[in-house]
Amino acid sequence: MYYKFIREEKIKMKRKEYTAVNFSNADFSKPLCGFTFTDCNFVNANMREAEIHGCEFIDCDMRGADLSLSIIKNTVFTSDVEYSLDLLGANIEYADIIDSKFRRCNMAGVNLRASRIYNTELYSVRLKDAKLTSARFVNSILEDSHYSGERDFVLVHTEWRD
């Protein structure tokens, strides 16, 4: 698979595991399937409309990354790094989001159907028209996060503070 960088460079992703690799400003236009990224830099990466399946993002810096309108399935985000990204309309079904912090993220129209969100903090997150059917928020905090939609999700030991 090739990924085009802003500087018109191309790299071929030959491995399935990457540690401490700088993908800042990268343009991910091809599907990502079965990759593990640990301590990688995705600052301002363009993942708009990306297809991400069966991947793990462990302690990656994703500030400013654009995942809007992406399809993200069976993917794990584990981090104590603060995310500030655009997830507008992203499809994040069946994902595991663990030990993460989302601040000032645009998650309007995001589809988190059947996703599991554990030990995660969402601050000032815009969840307008988000689809949370069967999503499970466990030991999480949602603060100043605005949601409009049906309450057909599960909150377990989770605080929702407006």
Question: What is each stretch, according to the model?
Answer:
Residues 2-162:
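Tandem repeat scaffolds
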